[in-house]
Amino acid sequence: MKFRPYHNDIWMREGTQFRPALEGETMEIFNYLVEFMRTLVTYAFNLTEMVGFPSYGMAIIILTVFIKAILAPLTVKQIKSMKAMQELQPRMKELQDKYKNDPARMQAEMAAMYKELGVNPLAGCLPLLVQMPFLIAIFYALQGYPYNPAFEHFLWLPSLGEADPYYILPVLSALSTWVMSKQTGMGASGAAAQQQKIMTIFMPLFIGYISLNFPSGLVIYWIVSNVFQFVQQHFIYKGLEANK
C-alpha cells in the first residue's frame, strides 16, 4: 500500500503499520513516544476485548486515567507549589509596593522570603515541563489513530476518529475546562486573580471552539483528563487546608 495522508498528515500508513510524519532527528525521540502512546491505546482496547466489551471509547478513558495516575506525583508537586505562590501574593504585593523604586532590593527581599518559607517559585514549572511531552504525544497519537471501523463508534458518536456531529463533546470540553479554571483560580489575589479571571473566560471558549473539529476520541481524552484532575485537586486542596 502506498503512503497516504491520514488525519492532517500527522501519521502515514504503510501496509498495516503506521509511522509519524514528523521529520528531523530532533523529533525522533518524540516520534517514539507518540508510537508508544498509540501502542498503549491498542493495549487498552485489547483489554476491553478480553472482558467481552470491545470499545475504543472505554480504551481511551482507561488510558487517560492510567496516564494521569502515573503523572500524579508530578501534578501534586505542581499544585502544591502553585498554591504556595498564591498564598504569598499579598506579601509579594507589599514588597513590590515598598521597593518599587529599588528593583534590586525588591528581588533580594523576595529571595529572602522564599528562602525563609521554603518556597521555590520555579518548583511548579519543572513538573509541568516533564508532563508536556506525554500530553502532546497522546494528542498526536489520538489525532490520527487508525480505529477498527467495527468498533470506532461510542455512545452517540458514530466515529471516534471524526468530530462530534451533535456538538455535545465540544460543550462538555468547554464546561470541564471552565470548572477546572475556576478551581485552579481559587485563592488567587491581585494581578494573579485578574489574569486567572481572563483565562477562566478565554480558555473554555477556545477549547470548546477547537473541539468542534477535533476527533471525538481526542476530545474524550481532554474531558476525562479534566474530570480526573478536578477530583485530584479537590483532595489535594482539602489536604492542604487540613494541614494549616
Q: PLM features: residue spans?
A:
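Helix-loop-helix
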Residues: 18-244
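Low-complexity, intrinsically disordered or signal/transmembrane-proximal segments
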Residues: 6-7, 17
